[in-house]
UniProtKB/Swiss-Prot annotation:
One Pfam short name: NIR_SIR_ferr
Protein name: Sulfite reductase, dissimilatory-type subunit beta
GO function term, MF aspect, one: heme binding
Binding site for [4Fe-4S] cluster 2: C231, C258, C261
Reactions mediated catalytically: [DsrC protein]-trisulfide + NAD(+) + 3 H2O = [DsrC protein]-dithiol + sulfite + NADH + 3 H(+)
Residues holding [4Fe-4S] cluster 1: C151, C188, C189, C193
Cofactor notes: Binds 2 [4Fe-4S] clusters per subunit. Binds 1 siroheme per subunit.
Database matches in InterPro entries: NiRdtase/SiRdtase_haem-b_fer (IPR005117), Nit/Sulf_reduc_fer-like_dom_sf (IPR036136), NO2/SO3_Rdtase_4Fe4S_dom (IPR006067), NO2/SO3_Rdtase_4Fe4S_sf (IPR045854)
Cofactor(s) required, per the database record: [4Fe-4S] cluster; siroheme
Amino acid sequence: MAFISSGYNPAKPMENRITDIGPRKFTEFFPPVIAKNAGNWDYHEILEPGILVHVAKNGDKVFTVRCGAARLMSTSHIREACEIAKKFCNGHLRFTTRNNIEFMVDNEETLKALVADLKTRKFAAGSFKFPIGGTGASISNIVHTQGWVYCHTPATDASGPVKAVMDELFEEFTSMRLPAIVRVSLACCINMCGAVHCSDIGLVGIHRKPPMIDHENLANLCEIPLAVAACPTAAVKPITAEVNGQKVKSVAINNDRCMYCG
């Protein structure tokens, strides 16, 4: 009855059926100039570091401003990016696979105003909120794995080391004086979900010692059977440990079998 009341007709089961319940089709989010010229672009050029122009066969142009951004952003920072997009780009923006934000406009006057606005937006310490660069023969934005904020296997955090590295390499992000584009990535452990092995320079955090066991709290922090099953070398086994005169369920590590995966 619930299905019938919602409009479902048993006699015509395919009528008004929704067959795609995933994300909306990506073409719905194109800026008008890109939607108009999809598949009909003639060429593109890098006008200066971080600024590109794509020219369609009919002469239409779209100017793209690429800004470096963090992988993990605050809601206030995202809202500010949306505010910029609403002010200059009719509400359109896009994120690249290397955590850049791209703002797209269709005329040079708006482009100049957008760039001038981005250069005035700084954090309290003076660093740019939306640094322009990452195109051509430069260092692209660093991609990294999840880090301590969520993942339970990292040997190091991600955001701190990435910030420190990019502080040193910032000039190469905003210029194009290298022989070719250079990609730098960081993985917090050897699982390398950030695909650092596909980058020119990979920073990998590794565990050097077997894990220490907190027998008192282990059973309250994880499911012991899953912890045992997760070990790829069978180095973890369940035991009954004694803590403050009480027996508790815990695990023991076979150090000779441990591969330090985290």
